[in-house]
Amino acid sequence: TKAVIIADGGFEGIFNGTGIGFGMDLALQSGIPLRDMEFISKTPFGVTNSKLTLSSNMLGYGANLCDTSGNTITAENFVQLCDVTAQSSGAVIDGRDMGDDKVWWQSAFRTVKSSTGVDMNKYTVGLENRVNQTLGGIATDECGRAVIGSWSRWFTGLYAAGDAACSGLNGAGALPGNRLLDALSGGSSSGNHASEWVKDQSFSNTDNLLASLE
């Protein structure tokens, strides 16, 4: 192998049973330290009694976030929204009055109905706060290279991207939409650098490989 790009998910599965961070574990067992593991991102749009998470963009298309009494829940930013919903007696999302924009969300509606039995065209859906993204991981530089030591020495041949990487793009808290941006930019940087770097490199452990074939 000339180069390896670790580009799997984070470890939010510790909290919600989805991604469990195999790539990070592989790096850690290879002696590569992980960075900023204390930083996580929460969402108030986790569908209760399921592993589903709805997009906050639904609010911009006419859906309403309410408490169990029907009062609209508002906040100045996403972090505050998480705090407000956590302090309320319960939260629901109402997608019944989204008008013509509802057609764009029918896939999400069908997924919710398949998982919970609730038809969002007719009923509200209960929500809960949950961890949906972890921000720590394999420290990378601007080229997507895994860095160690004082975060300045490359672990030669290793790259990371996506939720497995800690690029610094998100800081201590991710904004909605930046997860995709981080994955795209990290994947592009690591892929481009790796493809150029391997042109002048030899395969590692070639002698051992050839010896095993004799």
Where are these predicted regions, by residue range?
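Long, amphipathic alpha-helical stalk/connector segments used for oligomerization, subunit docking
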Residues: 197-214
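Short, intrinsically disordered, charge-balanced linker/junction segments flanking boundaries
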Residues: 1-5, 9-15, 69-76, 211-214
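Glycine-rich loop(s) and the adjacent beta-strand/alpha-helix scaffold that form part
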Residues: 3-52, 176-193
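Mobile, glycine/GP-rich and aromatic-enriched active-site lid/loop segments adjacent to catalytic centers
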Residues: 1, 38-174
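Secondary-structure transition/capping motifs at alpha-helix termini
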Residues: 28-35, 145-147, 152-154, 196-202
